[in-house]
Structure formats: structure tokens, C-alpha cells
Amino acid sequence: GNGSDEVLDLIFRVFCEPREDNVIVLPPTYGMYEVLANINAIELVKIPLVENFQPNVKEIVKCQDAKTKVLFLCSPNNPTANSFNASKIETLIKEFNGIVVIDEAYIDFSIEDSWLGRLDEFPNLIVTQTLSKAYGLAAIRLGICYASKEIISILNKIKPPYNVNQLTQ
């Protein structure tokens, strides 16, 4: 996509119905999730991180309902810089009824492994990355989305044509 923000916006547009659905975020976290929720008229459910800036798995699972479509996990997290515990993430992917997005914009600064190698295990998992941070290439505006073939096919149907410029390609 034209930056990770476009990829995140496409996820809202594909999986959420405006003025009906909600998504879950874990503050403190990347502020663009809230901006995109507002732009797309999607309710934002905030479940704060707990001790050591980790997800409150029980609360997240408890708070989802039929209208909860996406869970955003920014790991490594912006602004706290920590990665979420892998077993907590795995539990959330398995117990969350919608799409789980792991935003790995800062993965190149982490000692933890990316979730890319586990995409085939979880059909509800989307991993996003960027070249803006570790590679210092923010100006080329390249956001990367990894997911099942089915999810990528749907996202490709609604993305604008020619959204990635020639230099970036």
C-alpha cells in the first residue's frame, strides 16, 4: 500500500460496517488506529495495556461481541517500544472471533521473531510492516500487508489502482 496507514485503512474498510461495528485497540498505542476508526465511523473499544505494557487477554476476549471485527496489536508497540508476549498473542489470535492485525512497523528493532512465519497457522491473522522505520525509507510510502490469499484478494479488490508509485515498485 501507499504507506502502512493505507493498508490499515483498507482493513477498516473491508472488515467493518460504518456506524455498526467496533474494533479493539490497546492504549497506549499507535494513534492512527483511532484516526482511521473516526474517518471510517467505526467505534473504538480501548482496553489499556496492563503490567509491563502487556495485553489484558481475559479482558479483550470478554469485551468482544458480535460487532467486534478487528483487534489491533502494535508489537513492538508504539510508543512503549516493547513487544507483546508471544503466548499472549497466540491466545488472542485463537480466541478472538475476528481479524487480528499485528502491526510490526518496528519489528526490525526487536529481538522477538516476526509473526510472518506463522501466517499459515491462523487464517484470521494479518501482519503489517513498513520500510519507513529501520530502513529510513518513509518517503517511498511502502506499507506491506501479509495475510492469507483470501484476505489479500479482498483487500486488492478495494485498494485504489496505481497506489504504489513507480519508484517504490
Language model regions located:
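Conserved acidic residues
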Residues: D21, K69, L125
